[in-house]
């Protein structure tokens, strides 16, 4: 039991605090206020006092008997076969508790001492006392028995001075042996009294022999002195407490029984001293951890952790991930020690172990060509490379990041050709981040366009200097001053106007100004003082990645520092692998690639995202560990993002009709185009319809994609990829819609048309005529008929109507009949009287009948 205050104890027992304080004072416990602490020993003392005050006695000795039986088998050899003999050993032990009657023995002892002192004072000589003692047979034996009992009690007190009262043993002992044990206690008390009488008599006789002359005068003083000495004398047998248990083993010898009993008591004492304490564990918590994992680390049930989270206002399931801070609060609240684990320690260790020390040498600049679509970026690069790259692109537009390096008379330059279409915003941003100089191509006849502004923003965000190439100067509509004025509004000031941006007029068609452009680029690179360490391990960025059926995963990388060699172990984003082959932009195999050189590498176990950094690591095991760590981190982040999105949209979508979704399975040839398409399709739609990408990936359309589209009722979109034979068979058999595209414009337009067709129709009401009720009369065929005058427009028999009374719509329905004189007519124009029969409604004089028409309005996104 833990220590509690007097107030808490009073609440537990259901008694007033004042009454409890009075009872504690009566029991000899000094307590002043209700905030004082009550220990276990004080509780026991108070309980004993209350029981005595109610007439209950503690003098009943109790005992418990334990029986144990063991059976063994002995093999006896003799004539014939061996015989087995079963030997059964039975033991019985009885545990007896001495009662609280020892207090009565104390009082009896005091009376015996006083009586012995009085008798000793009355005797005159020592010889008379000795004769009296000799007349008592067995006295010496009794004294020896008492001394042995005292010695045993002293040993037991020494061994168990700190043992707590064994209340459970007291309650389990039977009360059937109360009488016999009380007789034994009485015999022990008589023996102690006789021993005390003998010792007091001897002391009194010795005192009287020394001072016979003052025997009469000091007789009362001697009696008081004996009482005072007996008061300070150590108490022998009565010191045994009620919690002391004597074990008697009936089949053991009298000498071994006390020893074994003491050993058992010592063991029980050790067990009792062990207080039940909660196990404090060291919980290692990573950046993200699920509720089930946290519960397992603390060795508790997951429900307990969920309850703690609910108390903190967090609703979570067993498999849901929680962040490190929340997990730390839960673990500390449950009494455990927390050790925060930085999961990226493995990644940091690998990256820090790679050294890029060495001699720095100048490197070629990496130049990105940016601009609006159809402004001539790729054509300009064609003229520089003396190649026809633009003719190979579908639709004449660039849909991938092309990486090339060109040897010029003035030095080597590496070019990155980025797409200009709006869907490739992320690809342009990646191109600006991994480049040194940006060539901004602006058509002289078109000026600054939206993607031109975006390219300027990307270049400024990356801190990359600009060189403006004013293209299409060979056209008659060319106006370079217009380009300068529009770019100056974007804070791109030409050098001629006092700025720091070089403007070079060029023509990709005729080649005019190309040399000046290269000169400007090399001049800008000299000002940047670009350097790298060629002897270090390779490091750079992934430009593009794709999945080739014959070659596997192919990644286009740009080496920014060090040298990438054939056979190196490359870690790129969430994937790793050994470089099995390296191919340059001309399709030639190379053994190494230095700084600023773009190459294609084969051998990765997946297609990394465009923009991921790659690095050469010395150990494949470390590379695998880092890649797996990144994959797990990305998966947990994605799950958390989905969970947060679902919780945010839970109440928004409550009560609303279901949003119509167009399910799409999207497959592309390269990773960059996949990201661009996913981003472009996600922007299409509104609160009624939207695009849902069921699955996406790089590579051809497989049987798995076809089965997934069949189960989700999705359409399959292939961008520069085709379906294999098994996938085509499923598509033809099940009637799945499969579409191939090579231009991104067409995908976006077709998806917009499909979503437009899914929109709910919208109707507009046009009022075509009004009529005023002048009179009403009954007709045996149609019931009530209203005589009306057509005020505006025309009244048609087959169109819906409204009835207005005091300019308030009171009825909406349809006409039952329309007559001009006695003839049924289809319409009645303005200024003409007619008879109108309204179905299921009675009109009054002065009402206005309004005829309207519902027109369906085509909706668009």
UniProtKB/Swiss-Prot annotation:
Where is region (G5) located?
A: 507-509
Q: Which UniProt keywords apply?
A: Cytoplasm, GTP-binding, Initiation factor, Nucleotide-binding, Protein biosynthesis
Region named G1: 371-378
Q: What is its main location?
A: cytoplasm
Ranges for the region named G3 are 417-420
Record field: compositional bias (Basic and acidic residues)? 115-128, 210-228
**Where do the segments described as Disordered lie?**
107-272
Which residues are recorded as binding GTP?
371-378, 417-421, 471-474
- Residue spans with biased composition (Polar residues)? 148-158, 169-180
Compartment(s) of residence: Cytoplasm
- Domain of life here? Bacteria
Q: Where is this region: G2?
A: 396-400
Can you give the residue ranges of the tr-type G domain? 362-531
Composition bias (Basic residues) maps to: 260-269
Could you state one GO cellular component term attached to this entry? cytosol
Pfam families according to UniProt: EF-G_D2, GTP_EFTU, IF-2, IF2_assoc, IF2_N
What SUPFAM superfamilies does this protein's entry cite? Initiation factor IF2/eIF5b, domain 3 (SSF52156), P-loop containing nucleoside triphosphate hydrolases (SSF52540), Putative DNA-binding domain (SSF46955), Translation proteins (SSF50447)
GO molecular function annotation: GTP binding; GTPase activity; translation initiation factor activity
* Spans annotated as G4: 471-474
Q: Which InterPro entries match?
A: DNA-bd_dom_put_sf, EF-G-like_DII, IF2_assoc_dom_bac, IF2_II, IF2_N, P-loop_NTPase, Small_GTP-bd, T_Tr_GTP-bd_dom
**Family in the record:** Belongs to the TRAFAC class translation factor GTPase superfamily. Classic translation factor GTPase family. IF-2 subfamily.
Q: What does this protein do?
A: One of the essential components for the initiation of protein synthesis. Protects formylmethionyl-tRNA from spontaneous hydrolysis and promotes its binding to the 30S ribosomal subunits. Also involved in the hydrolysis of GTP during the formation of the 70S ribosomal complex.
Q: Please give the HAMAP family that the UniProt record associates with this protein.
A: IF_2_B
User: What's the protein name?
Assistant: Translation initiation factor IF-2
Organism whose genome encodes this protein: Hahella chejuensis (strain KCTC 2396)
């Amino acid at each position: 039991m833990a220590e509690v205050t007097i107030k808490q104890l009073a609440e537990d027992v259901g008694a007033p605090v004042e009454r409890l304080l009075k009872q504690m004072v009566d029991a000899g416990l000094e307590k002043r206020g209700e905030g004082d602490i009550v220990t276990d020993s004080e509780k026991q003392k108070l309980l004993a006092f209350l029981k005595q005050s109610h007439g209950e006695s503690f003098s009943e000795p109790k005992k418990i008997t334990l029986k144990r039986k063991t059976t063994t088998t002995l093999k006896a050899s003799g004539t014939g076969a061996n015989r087995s003999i079963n030997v059964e050993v039975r033991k019985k032990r009885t545990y007896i508790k001495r009662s609280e009657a020892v207090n009565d023995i104390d009082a009896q002892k005091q009376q015996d001492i006083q009586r012995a002192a009085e008798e000793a004072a009355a005797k005159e000589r020592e010889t008379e006392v000795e004769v009296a003692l000799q007349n008592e047979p067995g006295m010496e034996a009794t004294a020896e028995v008492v001394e042995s009992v005292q010695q045993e009690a002293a040993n037991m007190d020494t061994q168990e001075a700190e043992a707590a009262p064994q209340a459970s043993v007291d309650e389990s002992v039977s009360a059937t042996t109360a009488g016999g044990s009380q007789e034994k206690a009485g015999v022990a008390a008589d023996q102690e009294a006789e021993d005390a009488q003998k010792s007091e008599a001897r002391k009194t006789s010795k005192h009287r022999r020394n001072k016979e002359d003052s025997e009469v005068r000091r007789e009362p003083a001697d009696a008081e002195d004996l009482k005072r000495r007996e008061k300070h004398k150590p108490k022998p047998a009565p010191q045994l407490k009620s919690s002391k248990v004597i074990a008697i083993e009936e089949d053991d010898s009298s000498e071994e029984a006390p020893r074994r009993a003491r050993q058992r008591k010592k063991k029980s004492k050790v067990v009792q001293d062990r207080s039940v304490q909660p196990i404090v564990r060291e919980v290692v918590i990573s950046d993200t951890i699920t509720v089930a994992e946290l519960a397992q680390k603390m060795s508790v049930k997951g429900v307990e952790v969920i309850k703690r989270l609910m108390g903190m206002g967090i609703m979570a399931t067993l498999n849901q991930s929680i962040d490190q801070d929340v997990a730390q609060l839960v673990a500390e609240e449950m009494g455990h020690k927390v050790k925060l684990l930085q999961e990226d320690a493995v990644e940091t260790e690998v990256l820090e172990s790679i050294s890029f020390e060495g001699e720095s040498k100048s490197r070629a600049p990496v130049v990105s060509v940016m601009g609006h679509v159809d402004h001539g970026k790729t054509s300009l690069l064609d003229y520089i490379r003396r190649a026809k790259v633009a003719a190979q692109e579908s639709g004449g537009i660039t849909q991938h990041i092309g990486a090339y390096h060109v040897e010029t008379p003035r030095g080597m330059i590496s070019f990155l050709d980025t797409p200009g279409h709006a869907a490739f915003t992320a690809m342009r941003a990646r191109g600006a981040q991994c480049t040194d100089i940006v060539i901004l191509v602006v058509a002289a006849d078109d000026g600054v366009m939206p993607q031109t502004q975006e390219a300027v923003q990307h270049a400024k965000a990356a801190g990359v200097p600009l060189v403006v190439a004013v293209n299409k100067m060979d056209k008659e509509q060319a106006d370079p001053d217009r380009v300068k004025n529009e770019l100056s509004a974007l804070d791109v000031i030409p050098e001629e106007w006092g700025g720091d941006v070089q403007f070079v007029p060029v023509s990709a068609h005729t080649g005019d100004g190309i040399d000046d452009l290269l000169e400007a680029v090399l001049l800008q690179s000299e000002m940047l003082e670009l350097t790298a360490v060629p002897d270090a391990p390779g490091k750079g960025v992934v430009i593009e990645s794709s999945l080739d059926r014959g070659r596997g995963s192919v990644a286009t990388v740009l080496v920014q520092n060090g040298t990438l060699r054939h056979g190196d172990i490359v870690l790129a984003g969430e994937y790793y692998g050994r470089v099995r082959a390296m191919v340059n932009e001309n399709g030639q195999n190379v053994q190494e690639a230095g700084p600023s050189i773009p190459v294609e590498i084969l051998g990765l176990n997946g297609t990394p995202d465009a923009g991921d950094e790659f690095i050469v690591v010395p150990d494949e095991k470390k590379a695998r560990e880092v890649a797996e760590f990144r994959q797990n981190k990305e998966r947990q982040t994605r799950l958390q993002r989905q969970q947060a999105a679902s919780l945010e949209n839970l109440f928004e979508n409550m009560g609303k009709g279901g949003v119509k979704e167009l399910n799409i399975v999207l497959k592309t040839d390269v990773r960059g185009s996949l990201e661009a398409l996913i981003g472009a399709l996600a922007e299409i739609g509104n609160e009624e319809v939207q695009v849902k990408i069921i699955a996406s990936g790089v590579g051809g359309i497989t049987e798995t994609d076809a089965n997934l589209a069949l189960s989700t009722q999705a359409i399959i979109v292939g961008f520069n990829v085709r379906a294999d034979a098994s996938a085509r068979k499923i598509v033809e058999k099940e009637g799945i819609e499969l579409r191939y595209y090579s231009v991104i414009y067409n995908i976006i337009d077709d998806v917009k048309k499909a979503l437009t067709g899914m929109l709910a129709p919208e109707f507009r009401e046009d009022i075509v005529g009004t009529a005023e009720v002048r009179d009403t009369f009954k007709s045996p065929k149609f019931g009530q008929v209203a005589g009306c005058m057509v005020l505006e427009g025309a009244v048609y028999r087959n169109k819906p109507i409204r009835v207005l009374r005091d300019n308030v719509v009171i009825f909406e329905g349809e006409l039952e009949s329309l007559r001009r004189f006695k003839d049924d007519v289809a319409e009645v124009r303005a200024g003409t009287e007619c008879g109108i029969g309204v179905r299921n409604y009675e009109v009054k004089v002065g009402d206005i009948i309004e005829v309207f028409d519902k027109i369906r309005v085509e909706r668009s996104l």
